[in-house]
Amino acid sequence: MSQNETLPSLHPLFNLVVSRLLSFGYQLLDGDNDKINYSCRFVSEYIHNFCNIYGPLPKRLTFYTVDKISGDFLKSKFMTGNLSFNDIDFNAPAVKSLTEGDASASFAVDSSTNPAKRCADFIDLLAAPDKNVLYRFRRLEW
């Protein structure tokens, strides 16, 4: 980058995305700000293009967009092997069912769901675009 070029400003959703990542127990590392900012721009551009929206995103898409940005960022960290959480234990068995009267609980213990698979499923849930949400905001382009 030359001296005349400036770094891109932080995306308006940047702070919300950082808060969301911290709520998952992710600790920010050096260099994450640029990656988060890139994910903000990437996901926002996808939504703008899919919905044919010119101008700012509708406020009702804010938290949807924050989750998609968080998922995109975590997916890139996971795929490069640079992801670790402090608060989420993917080794713990997931609860399959829970009954309150006469207290019974069963856990979803399956050999096909190892911690890495659970982590990937969690990230996919965040990152996968729910087009039913986006269809509500889609506009025709003439």
Language model regions located:
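Conserved short "hinge" loops at termini or chain/domain junctions
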Residues: 1-64, 117-142
